[in-house]
Amino acid sequence: MSSLPVSESEGEGSGTSVQVPSRGGQVTPGEKAFSLRTKHVFLTYPRCPISPEEAGQKIADRLKNKKCNYIYISREFHADGEPHLHAFVQLEANFRTTSPKYFDLDEFHPNIQAARQPASTLKYCMKHPESSWEFGKFLKPKVNRSPTQSASRDKTMKQIMANATSRDEYLSMVRKSFPFEWAVRLQQFQYSANALFPDPPQTYSAPYASRDMSDHPVIGEWLQQELYTWSPGVRRRSLYICGPTRTGKTSWARSLGTHHYWQHSVNFLEEWNCQAQFNIIDDIPFKFVPCWKGLVGSQYDLTVNPKYGKKKRIPNGIPCIILVNEDEDWLQSMSTQQVDWFHGNAVVYHLLPGETFIPSE
């Protein structure tokens, strides 16, 4: 079963729960004393054969002087066949106890939490019940912000997004209109500012002139057939260059036109430039290149799953220039089938001894 959300409160009356001490109720060194103060309680009784009706009546009897609004108890079975109970309790006012055994049913001790999202907690309890018991009527907690207030805040935020002309101006307007949110959620506003006002793609400036490779028998042919001209509707082949360091490979490749450049790791979190003519994969071991067939094979659309971001679909259809040194030769890390596929989708070239992309003086 999915884990229960216990983050922000949906309304009034949220409380805090401290981890329960060990079964004997004794507080061991380094362990916090148990304390619960809340209007909404969520209980889980593992490996408990008591019926929901019996459990509910016992809990209701225990809370008879506490102005209890609502109780819901459900029974579920784990994959091993053992039953467990979920209980949700709603009271009129904040309930407080420092006894970790307050909700014990006979010898069965529950996990106790303050239900900070009452409606979500109740929905969780009702997800897959084998049987259930209910008492009273659940009262949805009041939302702290009225619809009018929410509409006003949304309107203000839309105006900020429409009128801001830069990241700094956007953040300044947010700070002025929403000072508390700006203080506690600055990182989120910075993220949205970067999304609204991304950095323009940087134009690469080569540190020195590179050798003209248009007459090279292998590289020149690739430039002409796969980069400068190509047949529409036909996936283009990539270029793989393996050779020593300090031969000018990177500077030459980056001077060919607008491109995506990845060194040491492929980062799909960066802004995707739809004007890029090719991708450059520089000094990245084969095993660390995600979607390598999609990139090398110039597939038109790629579905990527960045490590710290959401899965997304990006347009591609452009070839790669892959640059490696001999100690990271991709072909040495591939299976026979992968090598065959690679040769079918990329022009492979190993620099000859003394060959360089740096023009002679």
Swiss-Prot record:
Q: How is the cofactor bound, in the record's words? A: Divalent metal cations, possibly Mg(2+) or Mn(2+).
The answer to whether keyword Protease applies is: no
In residue numbers, the region (Oligomerization) covers 192-204
- Domain CRESS-DNA virus Rep endonuclease span(s) in chain numbering: 35-138
Annotated Pfam families = Gemini_AL1, Gemini_AL1_M
Query: Coordinates of motif RCR-2 in the sequence?
Result: 84-86
Query: Which residues take part in binding ATP?
Result: 243-250
Keyword terms of this UniProt record:
ATP-binding, Covalent protein-DNA linkage, DNA replication, DNA-binding, Endonuclease, Helicase, Host nucleus, Hydrolase, Metal-binding, Multifunctional enzyme, Nuclease, Nucleotide-binding, Nucleotidyltransferase, Repressor, Transferase
The biological process GO terms on file are: DNA replication
What is the residue range of the motif RCR-3? 124-127
Species lineage: Viruses, Monodnaviria, Shotokuvirae, Cressdnaviricota, Repensiviricetes
UniProt-annotated stretches for the region Disordered: 1-31
* Active site: residue positions: 124 (for dna cleavage activity)
User: Where can the motif RCR-1 be found?
Assistant: 42-45
For this UniProt entry, the molecular function terms from Gene Ontology, in alphabetical order, are: ATP binding; DNA binding; endodeoxyribonuclease activity, producing 5'-phosphomonoesters; helicase activity; metal ion binding; nucleotidyltransferase activity; structural molecule activity
Q: What is this protein called?
A: Replication-associated protein
* Cysteine disulfide partners in this protein: none
Q: Where is this region: Transactivation?
A: 266-285
Q: What is known of its domains?
A: There are 3 rolling circle replication (RCR) motifs. RCR-2 is probably involved in metal coordination. RCR-3 is required for phosphodiester bond cleavage for initiation of RCR.
Quaternary structure note: Homooligomer. Rep binds to repeated DNA motifs (iterons). Forms the O-complex, which is a Rep-DNA complex involved in the initiation of RCR. Part of the C- and V-complexes which are RepA-Rep-DNA complexes involved in the c-sense and v-sense transcription.
Q: Outline what the protein does.
A: Essential for the replication of viral ssDNA. The closed circular ssDNA genome is first converted to a superhelical dsDNA. Rep binds a specific region at the genome origin of replication. It introduces an endonucleolytic nick within the conserved sequence 5'-TAATATTAC-3' in the intergenic region of the genome present in all geminiviruses, thereby initiating the rolling circle replication (RCR). Following cleavage, binds covalently to the 5'-phosphate of DNA as a tyrosyl ester. The cleavage gives rise to a free 3'-OH that serves as a primer for the cellular DNA polymerase.
Give residue numbers for sequence motif Nuclear localization signal.
307-317
Q: Where does a divalent metal cation bind?
A: 76, 84, 86
